[in-house]
């Protein structure tokens, strides 16, 4: 039988898990947050934080830390539909800008904030199993790198471990509003492609691509096509990616003058909602609901989930 060593155990320490652990610890709950990764480390993400997410960082006292890393603000969103472009400020007077911090920076900042708030952080810890007793989640079993399996108990276990959540698999929540993958997208980073504080997206028939600035003078450029074309297009990702950019010739010229600084990364994701709570457990972030990344809402939604869960 698991002993309730902790009030809450959070599985996953990235954009959903660390804020959840931080806010719980600030309220005085004895909190453990675990992740199989160590930090700083990267993950597949286009890492755009829309203004509502920026406001959350400000509420938590973390925005100044982010801006101190040199992440450039994004003060204009422009949507190019071909015949016309709609552009304007992305936010409000309270939250006028967006940011796109690299996950190596943002996730480390959030993990450190959770630790400073009093949460116990275990990096490099792999959860093997969720402990369920009499229909209620009571803890986890797992191990550190090279270590023996240990059990930890808690009143509540929160799954912040992404769309392939081990916690969700263990508790088997109702899943609804399911949609298959609709889009396949790839992104990479370019130097010599100044954005001057702009997020630019281009909407074309069966294609969409966008660009925005991030750390170290780099610009993230992502493009996508229908999932039905994914198998054919993955045979030449770079060629199909560059061909797609030609649908906006002036933008393609800017990319040709730039230098690619990283490999292509990409994915296609299914869309679903899961019931996010039950006896002794809850789900936050992509573990609770996952949506096509064309919205770039994942980080903002993870922050919102953290606050809703703790409240």
Q: Positions of the model-derived regions?
A:
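Conserved Rossmann-like nucleotide-cofactor binding loop
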Residues: 16, 39, 164
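Glycine-rich FAD pyrophosphate-binding loop
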Residues: 25-45
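Predominantly flavin-linked oxidoreductase catalytic cores and closely associated redox partners
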Residues: 113-251
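Beta1/beta-strand and adjacent pyrophosphate-binding region of the FAD-binding site
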Residues: 2-16
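Conserved hydrophobic helix-helix packing surfaces used for dimerization/oligomerization
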Residues: 8-10, 31, 281
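Conserved N-terminal glycine-rich FAD pyrophosphate-binding loop of Rossmann-like flavoproteins
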Residues: 38-58, 62
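FAD/FMN-dependent oxidoreductases across multiple families
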Residues: 69, 231-311
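A conserved beta-strand/loop capping segment in the N-terminal third of enzymes
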Residues: 58-108
């Amino acid at each position: 039988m698991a002993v309730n060593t902790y009030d809450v155990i959070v599985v996953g320490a990235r954009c959903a898990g660390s804020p959840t652990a931080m806010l719980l610890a600030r309220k005085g709950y004895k909190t453990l947050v675990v992740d199989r990764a160590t930090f700083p480390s990267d993950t597949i993400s286009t890492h755009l934080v829309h203004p509502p997410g920026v406001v959350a960082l400000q509420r938590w006292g973390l925005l100044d830390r982010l801006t101190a890393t040199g992440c450039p603000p994004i003060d204009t969103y422009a949507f190019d539909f071909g015949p016309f472009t709609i552009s304007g400020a992305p936010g409000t007077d309270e939250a006028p800008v967006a940011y796109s911090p690299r996950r190596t920076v943002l996730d480390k900042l959030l993990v450190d904030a959770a630790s400073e708030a009093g949460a116990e952080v275990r990096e490099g810890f792999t959860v093997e199993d969720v402990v369920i007793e009499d229909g209620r989640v009571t803890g986890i079993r797992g191990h550190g790198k090279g270590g023996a399996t240990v059990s930890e108990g808690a009143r509540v276990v929160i799954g912040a471990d992404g769309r392939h959540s081990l916690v969700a698999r263990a508790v088997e929540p109702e899943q609804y509003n399911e949609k298959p993958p609709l889009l396949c997208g790839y992104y990479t980073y370019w130097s010599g492609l100044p954005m001057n504080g702009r997020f630019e997206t281009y909407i074309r028939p069966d294609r969409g691509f966008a660009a925005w600035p991030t750390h170290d003078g780099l610009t993230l450029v992502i493009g996508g096509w229908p999932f039905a074309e994914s198998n054919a297009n993955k045979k030449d990702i770079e060629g199909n990616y560059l061909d797609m950019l030609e649908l906006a010739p002036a933008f393609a010229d800017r990319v040709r003058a730039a230098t690619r600084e990283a490999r292509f990364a990409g994915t296609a994701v299914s869309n679903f909602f899961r019931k996010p709570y039950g006896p002794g457990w809850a789900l936050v972030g992509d573990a609770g609901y996952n949506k096509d990344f064309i919205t770039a809402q994942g980080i903002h939604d993870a922050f919102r989930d953290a606050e809703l869960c703790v409240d």
